[in-house]
From Swiss-Prot:
Name of the gene this protein is made from: PKLR
Protein name, UniProt field: Pyruvate kinase PKLR
Effect recorded for T408A: In CNSHA2; Hirosaki
Binding of K(+), residues: N118, S120, D156, T157
Domain of life: Eukaryota
Record function comment: Pyruvate kinase that catalyzes the conversion of phosphoenolpyruvate to pyruvate with the synthesis of ATP, and which plays a key role in glycolysis.
Stated consequence of mutating I310N: In CNSHA2; Dordrecht
Length: 574
């Protein structure tokens, strides 16, 4: 039977009557034709021969290459293996529960890629010690260059946020605000460290002017809500609408109020200078409302911090409405769902999440999904079913990174939380509808005369067509790796670089596995290229996603330096 005759006979049959193995006939293996422009049918025997032992490519393969989205959903198989190597990066917040060197080593082994320091809490001395601990933990893996794991350090600014003061029992104490009781919200400095169940201090002096009678004050991600009854000389007299346990330094939201805080406070500027001095890789800029807020952060970093990536956190209605202008000047976006879910209706947060992730994917910029992803694991060893679905759906939406906050900063199970996110992400990545995703990204890509971008598109398409197990890219700044990530290859992108900062920062990009190559350059350029490519291959074998007989796509430059990536070749692993 000819291939064309085989196509006709297959089209007459319903997919329901086929085994999943037979449905794998409809996969991407290189010849043009079909609705996507590059699809043809192949026999099961040919499929097996083409794929060989390329385990990395076979997870949820029938679903990934289905003809329609509905068919893709129907073909998802709970018995299919997860992907061999997780593509989505995990950001873990470092706090009292996780800042020891030994605990950090465990978290790195569990899958932490980026360590986040929340500058809403802690002194500069505290964070300097945390940074030193992270670097000590990372360097403990430096014995073998093949198993070394670069970990980026991110500084999360306080931003123009409002917080409560410290309770009179100390920073670790808690009080319960009972529903129906009266609470005075004050800006009197005398209560800054003497808060209690009757009086709550906040660090925003103008709160008495911007919140009217009947207005609401939300505390601790909206868990506690107060309704203003009277505006008095000492502050706002409120009634507890929704009670709860209040700790120190909790976030305060004033939805609908015209908060007149500057985009960057003096404390933020000091924190950013501290970050530059201590060599942080990423800044998470809080409460970004417009493009000029990002420019202010860039100016505060100064020329010494020009290489630091700025990820803008979208946390309010204005930020969502001005998203495009913020995205244009940012290195990436964080969907910060905590404050966002208070500033806009909670039932609309998922719309904002999907919109922002989609626009970031189209623009080729990293996007982080954050807040309450595994919140129950602060106190419990296992997440709720809804939380596991939330993490998986963030991955399916297209997030480059998923973040843990209190789960690792103060939770009882920080290592277990990282392991759980790792496991969920592996399963979700296998279930991505790769055929549709790549075709849409390629179709939406603007025309370009940039050799690096053109090479990246060609490399990803070639990887799909030959079912390559990996794309190995030699990169100086990480840009080539980010361009490859933009088109969401099903294969791993192994980025080999001599730049330690680039190796850490590419963790922001989905599917990129950075390798820091420490050997000095060879006198002959071609020899140096071959050594770095071989280093990438050996690392891929060691990590379990390259096997003998697999095909890999190699992307390199034609000369040393940045901006010369324009060569692609196909190698077979021997």
């Amino acid at each position: 039977m000819s291939i064309q005759e085989n196509i006709s006979s297959l089209q007459l049959r319903s997919w329901v009557s086929k085994s999943q193995r037979d449905l794998a006939k409809s996969i991407l293996i290189g010849a043009p034709g079909g609705p996507a422009g590059y699809l043809r049918r192949a026999s099961v025997a040919q499929l097996t021969q083409e794929l060989g032992t390329a385990f990395f490519q076979q997870q949820q393969l029938p679903a990934a290459m289905a003809d329609t989205f509905l068919e893709h959903l129907c073909l998802l198989d709970i018995d299919s293996e997860p992907v061999a190597a997780r593509s989505t990066s995990i950001i873990a917040t470092i706090g009292p529960a996780s800042r020891s060197v030994e605990r950090l080593k465990e978290m790195i082994k569990a899958g932490m890629n980026i360590a986040r320091l929340n500058f809403s809490h802690g002194s500069h001395e505290y964070h300097a010690e945390s940074i030193a601990n992270v670097r000590e933990a990372v360097e403990s893996f430096a014995g073998s260059p093949l198993s070394y794991r670069p970990v980026a350090i991110a500084l999360d600014t306080k931003g123009p946020e409002i917080r409560t003061g410290i309770l009179q029992g100390g920073p670790e104490s808690e009080v319960e605000l009972v529903k129906g009781s009266q609470v005075l919200v004050t800006v009197d400095p005398a209560f800054r460290t003497r808060g209690n169940a009757n009086t709550v201090w906040v660090d925003y002096p103008n709160i008495v002017r911007v919140v009217p009678v009947g207005g609401r004050i939300y505390i601790d991600d909206g868990l506690i809500s107060l309704v203003v009854q009277k505006i008095g000389p000492e502050g706002l007299v409120t009634q507890v609408e929704n009670g709860g346990v209040l700790g120190s330094r909790k976030g305060v939201n004033l939805p609908g109020a015209q908060v007149d805080l500057p985009g960057l406070s003096e404390q933020d500027v000091r924190d950013l200078r501290f970050g530059v001095e201590h060599g942080v890789d990423i800044v998470f800029a809080s409460f970004v409302r417009k493009a000029s807020d990002v420019a202010a952060v860039r100016a505060a970093l100064g020329p010494e911090g020009h290489g630091i990536k700025i990820i803008s956190k979208i946390e309010n209605h204005e930020g969502v409405k001005r998203f495009d202008e913020i995205l244009e000047v940012s290195d990436g976006i964080m969907v910060a769902r905590g404050d966002l879910g208070i500033e806009i209706p909670a039932e609309k947060v998922f719309l904002a999440q999907k919109m922002m992730i989609g626009r970031c994917n189209l623009a080729g910029k990293p996007v982080v999904c954050a807040t309450q992803m595994l919140e129950s694991m602060i106190t419990k060893p296992r997440p709720t079913r809804a939380e596991t679905s939330d993490v998986a759906n963030a991955v399916l939406d297209g997030a480059d990174c998923i973040m843990l906050s209190g789960e690792t900063a103060k939770g009882n199970f920080p290592v277990e939380a990282v392991k759980m996110q790792h496991a969920i992400a592996r399963e979700a990545e296998a279930a991505v509808y790769h055929r549709q995703l790549f075709e849409e990204l390629r179709r939406a890509a603007p025309l370009s005369r940039d050799p690096t971008e053109v090479t990246a598109i060609g490399a990803v398409e070639a990887a799909f067509k030959c079912c390559a197990a990996a794309i190995i890219v030699l990169t100086t700044t990480g840009r080539s790796a980010q361009l490859l990530s933009r088109y969401r290859p099903r294969a791993a992108v192994i980025a080999v670089t001599r730049s330690a900062q680039a190796a850490r920062q590419v963790h922001l990009c989905r599917g990129v596995f950075p390798l820091l190559y420490r050997e000095p350059p060879e006198a002959i350029w071609a020899d140096d290229v071959d050594r770095r490519v071989q280093f990438g291959i050996e690392s891929g074998k060691l990590r379990g996603f390259l096997r003998v007989g697999d095909l890999v796509i190699v992307v390199t430059g034609w000369r040393p330096g940045s901006g010369y990536t324009n060569i692609m070749r196909v190698l077979s692993i021997s």
